[in-house]
Design a protein with these regions (language model features):
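Extracytoplasmic/secreted proteins, especially bacterial periplasmic and envelope-associated proteins
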Residues: 51-58, 74-85, 90, 144-151, ...
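A non-catalytic alpha/beta surface segment that caps or lines the substrate-entry region
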Residues: 54-117
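Active-site-adjacent substrate-binding region
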Residues: 43, 207, 214-314
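Bacterial signal peptide processing site
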Residues: 15-17
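C-terminal motif of bacterial Sec signal peptides marking the signal peptidase cleavage site
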Residues: 10-13
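N-terminal capping segment at the start of a domain
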Residues: 28-74, 86, 129-130, 278-286
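Acidic/histidine-rich catalytic neighborhood of metal-dependent amide-processing enzymes
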Residues: 132-238, 242, 251-254
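Solvent-exposed, acidic/flexible segments
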Residues: 45-52, 65-76, 105, 121, ...
Length: 314
């Protein structure tokens, strides 16, 4: 993802492309986090930040997993196995991105589908691929949001929801080239949006909520200015009601990310992300950067906002 306001600040921090395996064999051993534990789930709407963190830990242990690599196949296996263990209906959507800077690349979107009597869909999304930088494990950028979405799936797949809910794990969000430029990005989310438009199901998607880089300590989530205002309002007002007003702030920031694939097709969408971190797209994006408390806060806002979203899209 790329922030128009922050891009110049971070371009110097971007790494350079490596082999398709992302030099997984040379990965630096991940460090354990030194943060206090996540709050008890009964204080965060049942969302367990410690469980979400364990998922991040497992994904980091795989090593680099850029699109098309052996590492990403192991990440896919892990995500699918976890979703099935929660009782979710899982759809694996294989596709090819034929025109990347490195040629044709096989990719896979993974979608957990939770049906209801109402056909309207609330779609949550996260990318799980890591940037093609040697030794880059993407603990925050790929890992944190995927961990949050897996824990959200555990809760949502076990209960009856008023609306149909899908949780999409996108491949190929990261650019293959060192810097972000269209069309070299968001391969997975663009593929899912296009396939839903082709099938006619896109009109059923009434809200799309993307999470990305939701692990740093002392996070600041700014209102993403491309996002749909009413959807951002629901998320941010929920955060304020829960006491997170100093984290979900009303300052704006423009971010290019997977949610644009749906916004461009007139689907209301919002992005929760803290890109203002010094380790973005560097090998310092390691496990010790991910705070279980931040995962719990993000998940708490997501799970508590579901009733308001269901009222809106009914």
């Amino acid at each position: 993802m790329l922030s128009a306001a922050l891009s110049l600040m971070y371009l110097a921090a971007c790494g350079h492309p490596s082999s398709s395996e992302g030099s997984a064999q040379g990965t630096v051993a991940p460090q354990a986090a030194t943060f206090p534990p996540a709050p008890a789930p009964e204080t965060t709407g049942g969302f367990d930040g410690a469980r979400a963190y364990k998922h991040v830990e497992q994904l980091v242990a795989i090593g680099p997993h850029p699109a098309g690599s052996e590492g990403i196949r192991r990440a896919q296996d892990y995500i699918v196995a976890q979703l099935k263990s929660f009782g979710c209906l899982v759809e694996e959507q294989d596709f090819h991105a034929p025109s990347t800077p490195v040629g044709d690349v096989a990719m896979k979107n993974i979608v957990a589908k939770i049906p209801s009597a109402n056909p309207n869909i609330i779609l949550y999304g996260s990318h799980y691929d890591t940037k093609r930088i040697a030794n880059f494990v993407g603990a925050d950028d790929a890992g944190s949001s995927t961990g949050v979405l897996l824990e959200l799936a555990r809760l949502l797949c076990a209960r009856k929801n008023a609306e149909t809910i899908w949780l999409a794990f996108f491949d190929g969000e990261e650019a293959f080239n060192p810097n972000w430029a269209d069309p070299d990005n968001t391969y997975g989310s663009r593929q899912l949006a296009a396939s839903l438009a082709l099938s006619g199901d896109l009109r059923r998607v009434k809200a799309m909520i993307l999470v990305d880089m939701v692990g740093p300590t002392n996070p600041v989530f700014r209102r993403e200015t491309n996002s749909t205002p009413w959807l951002t309002d629901i998320l941010w007002s929920t955060a304020a009601r829960l006491g997170y007003g100093r984290i979900f702030v009303n300052d704006g920031a423009e971010i290019e990310d997977d949610h644009l694939s749906f916004l461009k097709r007139n689907v209301p969408a919002a992005d929760i992300i803290d890109l203002d971190v010094p380790y973005w797209h560097t090998t310092q994006d390691t496990l010790d950067k991910v705070d279980p408390r931040t995962l719990a806060i993000t998940g708490h806002v997501l799970i508590e906002s579901v009733p308001e979203l269901e009222k809106r899209v009914k």
